[in-house]
């Protein structure tokens, strides 16, 4: 550090430090300070005498147990003798016995709660059944999938068009069909309307003369991609449409029909 930044400070030896101004002070706890606080009294445990315990009786096999029961108790059930014997637990049979020993049918509530494992029709009744075509499924998810996809009765609930008599299964298909009646896509040049935006875009190219889809094999170009796809079949080596009379092959079905209508010249 440079000398110019050092500050010389004189030490005053006559000034003594004042220790009473320190922040922390040591506190000495004296035992005489606890005299003003009462100490809690802890109760002593009570010592029981030998007379408080009842003597233990040891029974051996030679001495039978004939302890008298309290008055009013039955030796079999432990309940009051005036109440009679307690009825035994219900068995697995479908009938119970009354006090006279004769069989009596069980109640309707008990019969409904008991599982009918021996009856196979009872297990079939627990399956999930379609309320439209009465088909049964073992799980609820299978029934929901059936209603969504495979139920013929559900498929008959179609959506009908308000402009014509056509019906559709889904609401989305109906909305796409309604566009053929409303024709929301209108050409600004000639006023012709279309149902789809891409149809309008292909129509506008007929006004502008734009043909962005060109053939890589020849110099022809097309305004629509579908026309280019049909043109590329003429360059294909495999021509799958063959004439039955002269065995001539064509790349498109329309060309084959045109060939047959013009008159096929059969070679003799």
UniProtKB/Swiss-Prot annotation:
Cited InterPro entries: Snail/Krueppel_Znf, Znf_C2H2_sf, Znf_C2H2_type
| Stretches assigned to coiled coil | none
Record the organism. Rattus norvegicus
Annotated compartments: Nucleus; Cytoplasm
UniProt PTM comment: Phosphorylated by GSK3B. Once phosphorylated, it becomes a target for ubiquitination. Ubiquitinated by the SCF(FBXO11) complex; ubiquitination requires previous GSK3B-mediated SNAI2 phosphorylation.
For the region SNAG domain, what residue ranges are annotated? Answer: 1-20
Task: Describe, by residue range, where the zinc fingers (C2H2-type) fall in the chain.
Answer: 128-150, 159-181, 185-207, 213-235, 241-264
* Entry GO MF terms: chromatin binding; DNA-binding transcription factor activity, RNA polymerase II-specific; DNA-binding transcription repressor activity, RNA polymerase II-specific; E-box binding; RNA polymerase II cis-regulatory region sequence-specific DNA binding; RNA polymerase II transcription regulatory region sequence-specific DNA binding; sequence-specific DNA binding; sequence-specific double-stranded DNA binding
UniProt keyword annotation of Zinc-finger present: yes
The record's keywords, sorted A to Z, are: Cytoplasm, Developmental protein, DNA-binding, Metal-binding, Nucleus, Repeat, Repressor, Transcription, Transcription regulation, Ubl conjugation, Zinc, Zinc-finger
In terms of SUPFAM superfamilies, this protein maps to: beta-beta-alpha zinc fingers
Q: What is this protein called?
A: Zinc finger protein SNAI2
Instruction: Tell me the superkingdom of the source.
Output: Eukaryota
Q: How does it assemble?
A: Interacts (via SNAG domain) with LIMD1 (via LIM domains), WTIP (via LIM domains) and AJUBA (via LIM domains). Interacts (via zinc fingers) with KPNA2, KPNB1 and TNPO1. May interact (via zinc fingers) with IPO7.
Q: Which GO terms describe its biological process?
A: cartilage morphogenesis; cell migration involved in endocardial cushion formation; cellular response to epidermal growth factor stimulus; cellular response to fibroblast growth factor stimulus; cellular response to ionizing radiation; chromatin organization; desmosome disassembly; endothelial cell migration
Query: How does the record comment on the protein's domains?
Result: Repression activity depends on the C-terminal DNA-binding zinc fingers and on the N-terminal repression domain.
Q: Where is this region: Disordered?
A: 84-116
């Amino acid at each position: 550090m440079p000398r110019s930044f050092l500050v010389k400070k004189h030490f005053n030896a006559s000034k003594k430090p004042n220790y009473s101004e320190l922040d922390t002070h040591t506190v000495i706890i004296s035992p005489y300070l606890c005299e003003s606080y009462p100490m809690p009294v802890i109760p002593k445990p009570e010592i029981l005498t030998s007379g408080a315990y009842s003597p233990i009786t040891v029974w051996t096999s030679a001495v039978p147990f004939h302890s008298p029961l309290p008055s009013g108790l039955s030796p079999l059930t432990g309940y009051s003798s005036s109440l009679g014997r307690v009825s035994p637990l219900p068995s697995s049979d479908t009938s119970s016995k009354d006090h006279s020993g004769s069989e009596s049918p069980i109640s309707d509530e008990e019969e409904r709660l008991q599982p009918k494992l021996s009856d196979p029709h009872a297990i079939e009744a627990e399956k999930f059944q379609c309320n439209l075509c009465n088909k049964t499924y073992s799980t609820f998810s299978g029934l929901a999938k059936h209603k969504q996809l495979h139920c013929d009765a559900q498929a008959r609930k179609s959506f009908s068009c308000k402009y014509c008599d056509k019906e559709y299964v889904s609401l989305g298909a109906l909305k796409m069909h309604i566009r053929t009646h409303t024709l929301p896509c209108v050409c600004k040049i000639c006023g012709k309307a279309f149902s789809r935006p891409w149809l309008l875009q292909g129509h506008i190219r007929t006004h502008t003369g734009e043909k962005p889809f060109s053939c890589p094999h020849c110099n022809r170009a097309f305004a629509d991609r579908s026309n280019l796809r049909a043109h590329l079949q003429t360059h294909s080596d495999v021509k799958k449409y063959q004439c039955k009379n002269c065995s001539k092959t064509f790349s498109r079905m329309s060309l084959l029909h045109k060939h047959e209508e013009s008159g096929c010249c059969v070679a003799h």
